[in-house]
Regions:
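A structural signal for multi-pass alpha-helical bundles of membrane permease subunits
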Residues: 31-315
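Short, Lys/Arg-rich N-terminal segment immediately upstream of the first membrane anchor
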Residues: 18-30, 228
Length: 315
């Protein structure tokens, strides 16, 4: 038996590649650093400056309707928010409910659809592809679609429920504080479920066939196959998808505003809607900036905690 050593292979294939000196690597690294400067400048201008400016405005009483209103007020805006602004606390509560219910519902439905269509071929592949269609529909289009579906007179939802005998009189879905948030969440879940379906489908495709076959040889049941074999591979997709969807739902303005404009009676007013109303309806830029800073701080804390938990799980 002939044994081919690494040295022999290198010699037969030609002369070894020239060694790269430490100075060359350092020079190449500096070139890459200089190439990154334009991107850093653009990010600093597009993201950094507005963020710093918003923090500065949050400590002033800036109001576009008052030419003299640009004085420093310290932490007065924050004190008012926490102690004398019930709408802020309502909007924060609505944001949490909207985000939590939307992410959990869309994630569970996406997981069930991914598992149900995992091993199906033929026409079911086409069906699964069609399930991804809502993800490509613009948010404003989704908002107007469900806006007309939830109309009390002539809406598809009321007509279907009345034909099934579930209700006898039309429900004022978007004009009732009890049902408005539910209607908005349903529209959002329909729009974001395909994202989780795509994430979980890709994660299931990464499960090694050898592991699945070994589990079948050991006569693992469907539940054991799911909990012990597939779920560990789905964990990263679930964590990443949840983080991205929480950020998106926290910032979701066009869907809610197009359907309800935050009403009725502030029942669907979230933080992003409240900031918009303060800044562009009431022109209180200082107060709106204070809400925006708190909104950003909540997102940063959530992202930091979530990423740390993900790293601990991986380690």
């Amino acid at each position: 038996m002939t044994v081919i050593s690494p040295d022999a292979t290198t010699t037969a294939g030609g002369p070894p590649p020239p060694a790269v000196s430490r100075r060359s690597r350092r020079r190449r690294g500096r070139v890459f650093d200089w190439m990154a400067i334009p991107a850093i400048v653009v990010l600093a201008g597009v993201i950094g400056y507005p963020m710093v400016r918003a923090i500065q405005l949050s400590f002033t009483n800036t109001n576009l309707l008052n030419s003299g209103g640009n004085k420093s007020v310290g932490f007065s805006n924050y004190h008012t928010l926490f102690t004398n602004d019930p709408i802020f606390w309502q909007s924060l509560d609505h944001t949490m409910v909207y985000t939590f219910v939307s992410v959990v519902a869309a994630g569970l439905i996406g997981l069930l659809l991914a598992l149900a269509t995992e091993n199906l071929g033929g026409i079911w592949r086409v069906v699964r592809t069609m399930m991804l269609t809502p993800w490509g529909v613009p948010v404003v289009v989704v908002a107007f679609l469900f806006y007309y579906m939830f109309q009390d007179s002539g809406g598809v939802v009321n007509q279907a429920l009345m034909n099934l005998g579930i209700i006898h009189t039309p429900i004022l879905w978007l004009g009732n504080a009890r049902w408005a948030m539910t209607s908005v969440i349903v529209a959002n879940v329909w729009s974001t479920t395909p994202f989780f379906l795509l994430m979980f489908t890709a994660a299931l495709a990464s499960v090694p066939n050898e592991v699945v076959e070994a589990a079948r040889v050991d006569r693992a049941g469907a539940l054991s196959m799911l909990t012990r074999i597939k779920l560990p591979y789905l964990r990263t997709a679930a964590v990443l998808g949840t983080l991205l969807m929480v950020i998106q739902n926290f910032n979701n303005f066009p869907l809610i505003y197009s359907m309800t404009k935050g009403g009725p009676v502030n029942s669907t007013t979230t933080l992003v809607i409240y900031v918009y109303e303060l800044a562009f309806d009431q022109f209180h830029l200082g107060f709106a900036s204070a809400v925006g800073v708190i909104w950003l701080a909540i997102l940063l804390v959530f992202a930091a905690v979530f990423i740390r938990l993900m790293k601990e799980r991986v380690s």
